[in-house]
């Protein structure tokens, strides 16, 4: 099972938004590039980086930070506002091969095929709030059955997703793995669980679900709990494959 540290960027800084709300932003006095470098040195093979400014405001204010982080692009899965062919190509030219996409794929599933054509590994971000699928930086939501949606997207080459429980994101509440487990088994896709991976108990549960799904629960993404030292690097490494 992979344990993936998460770094969100907003206003050029490392940040977390509680439940995805801009007014609930927490900023951290950490240098993004130094943080990524240290994590790689600690042995983490994948880091989850999301540009919240691009996702929510379609702003490229964080692009200079993404350029700095491109030194470590092979270890990063990048997301946030990837809604156009041009922007996806721009990131790919910086070396970002794993790209997290959502809204554009909901509008045009063939975007997945385009990404593969430019040698990108697309990871679909399935964000749910109260059973509804959310998109456009979590500002909009729709009554869509997640399982049916994923089965349809598999026809366009979808293989891997991040499932985020928005109500738990940044709250330090525990992730409910029941829906994540159901998605992995019924849609038969590789899943990273996010939102509420907030304690060692979360990691223990994830490890159990990883076994129950025969590895379809590929890993977990740890944000605020990591940034605030609630889940230490040592503990996360203990559960990482």
From Swiss-Prot:
Its EC number is 5.3.1.16. It comes from the Bacteria. Gene3D superfamilies: Aldolase class I (3.20.20.70). GO terms for cellular component: cytoplasm. It comes from Thermotoga petrophila (strain ATCC BAA-488 / DSM 13995 / JCM 10881 / RKU-1). HAMAP family: HisA. Keywords: Amino-acid biosynthesis, Cytoplasm, Histidine biosynthesis, Isomerase. The active site is at 8 (proton acceptor), 127 (proton donor). It is an enzyme of class 5 (isomerase). It is found in: Cytoplasm. CDD domains: HisA. This is 1-(5-phosphoribosyl)-5-[(5-phosphoribosylamino)methylideneamino] imidazole-4-carboxamide isomerase. Pathway: Amino-acid biosynthesis; L-histidine biosynthesis; L-histidine from 5-phospho-alpha-D-ribose 1-diphosphate: step 4/9. GO terms for molecular function: 1-(5-phosphoribosyl)-5-[(5-phosphoribosylamino)methylideneamino]imidazole-4-carboxamide isomerase activity. One of its GO terms (biological process) is L-tryptophan biosynthetic process.
């Amino acid at each position: 099972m992979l344990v993936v540290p998460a770094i969100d960027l907003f206003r050029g800084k490392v940040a977390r938004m509680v439940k995805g709300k801009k007014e609930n932003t927490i900023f951290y006095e950490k240098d993004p590039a130094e943080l990524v470098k240290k994590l790689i040195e600690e042995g983490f093979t994948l880091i989850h980086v999301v540009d919240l400014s691009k996702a929510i405001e379609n702003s490229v204010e964080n692009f200079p930070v993404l350029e700095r982080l491109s030194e470590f692009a092979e270890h990063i899965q990048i997301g946030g506002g990837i809604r156009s062919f041009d922007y996806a190509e721009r990131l790919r030219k910086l070396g970002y091969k794993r790209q997290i996409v959502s809204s554009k794929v909901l509008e045009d599933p063939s975007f997945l095929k385009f990404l593969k054509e430019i040698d990108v590994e697309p990871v679909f971000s399935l964000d749910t709030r109260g059973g509804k699928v959310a998109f456009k930086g979590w500002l909009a939501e729709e009554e869509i059955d997640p399982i049916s949606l994923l089965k349809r997207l598999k026809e366009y080459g979808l293989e891997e997703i991040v499932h985020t429980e928005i109500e738990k994101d940044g709250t330090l509440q525990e992730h409910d793995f029941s829906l994540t487990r159901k998605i992995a088994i019924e849609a038969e896709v590789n899943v990273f669980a996010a939102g509420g991976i907030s304690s060692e108990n979360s990691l223990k549960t994830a490890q159990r679900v990883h076994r129950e799904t025969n590895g379809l629960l590929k890993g977990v993404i740890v944000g605020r709990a990591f940034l605030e030292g609630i889940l230490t690097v040592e503990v996360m490494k203990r559960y990482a494959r």
